[in-house]
Amino acid sequence: MLQQCCQLLEDRLLKVAFIESASSGYLTSQFSIHKNSGADILLGGLVSYDPRIKISVLKVDPKLIETYTAESPQVTEEMCRLGQTLFQQADIVVSC
């Protein structure tokens, strides 16, 4: 699956960035070491495992975390949206 994703991104000249929490940087790591593709497709990633990072770096509203939990779909969606401001050159931002 990783190889297919990397190949599709490379074929379409797309750049990806990751905003990770639960995966703790695993996706960024895997995409970065993919043979001959890492530098061509990966812009970077941010690991925001601790809610304080979500709040201070990504600027997630603390009330959203209080209402839904730091691992909720609502917070994850907001992380993705806010991650687009950090990685403006990314065609795709993935948050998990």
Name what the model sees in each region.
Residues 1-96:
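Short alpha-helical segments enriched in small residues
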